[in-house]
């Protein structure tokens, strides 16, 4: 699996067409911008990455960092991801975000044709599931106890925080400090020792 752009074009054409909302007709094909490719290469090439990606609204930050990039890492000849955690403003929000990657693993026939059945025989439920190759996926809400962020002895090695804040939180300085402390202490502390990609995405 050569590049993130290759896996995107090969396995996710349904994300790459802009359609007319009324007629459903294809208006144009959506291509990666250079910053998408640079970000993906940075994530892949830095096993202990700690990064914030701030892109304008509508620039597919969640699509890339929550779906394309982790699946690209997962399907490398030498697997580069073992335990992914998606963190949202609530557990429900995180579960919805994680549901996109779960749907691709379960129903994407191009992935299944090339990499085999992905739905594991073990637990396969909304918000927490394990793929057939053993990669674990978990949704986590803001402020949630990190004690659940383990799979036996395994720790997360890909944590992505997606739109953690909201208007109510931003108006309360103490809560902002509390969540900042939770991110720095609980989430950082949950990462696999010595390695692990920690990514935050948000709007400019």
Predicted feature descriptions by range:
Residues 127-186:
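Conserved RecA-like ASCE ATPase "motif II neighborhood" in helicase/translocase motors
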Residues 48-68:
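Walker A/P-loop
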Residues 66-78:
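Walker A/P-loop NTP-binding motif
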Residues 87-143:
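Conserved nucleotide-state-sensing and coupling region of NTP-binding domains
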Residues 30-45:
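N-terminal pre-P-loop "Q-motif" helix
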Residues 42-50, 78-79:
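Phosphate-binding P-loop
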């Amino acid at each position: 699996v050569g590049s993130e752009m290759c896996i995107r074009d090969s396995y996710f054409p349904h994300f790459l067409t802009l359609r007319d909302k009324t007629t459903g007709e294809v208006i144009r094909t959506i291509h990666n911008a250079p910053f998408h490719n640079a970000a993906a290469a940075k994530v892949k090439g830095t096993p202990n990455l700690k990064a914030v990606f701030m892109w304008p609204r509508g620039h597919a930050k969640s699509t890339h960092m929550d779906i394309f990039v982790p699946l690209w890492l997962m399907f490398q000849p030498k697997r580069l991801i073992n335990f992914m955690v998606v963190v949202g403003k609530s557990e429900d929000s995180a579960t919805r975000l994680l549901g996109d990657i779960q749907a691709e693993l379960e129903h994407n026939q191009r992935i299944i044709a090339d990499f085999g059945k992905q739905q594991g025989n073990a637990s396969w439920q909304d918000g927490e599931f394990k793929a057939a190759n053993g990669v674990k996926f978990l949704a986590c809400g803001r402020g949630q106890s990190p004690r659940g962020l383990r799979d036996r002895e395994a720790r997360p090695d890909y944590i992505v925080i997606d739109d953690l804040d909201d208007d109510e939180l931003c108006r309360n300085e103490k809560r902002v400090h509390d969540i900042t402390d939770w991110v720095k202490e609980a989430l950082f502390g949950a990462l696999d020792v010595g390695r692990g990609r920690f990514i935050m995405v948000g709007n400019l």
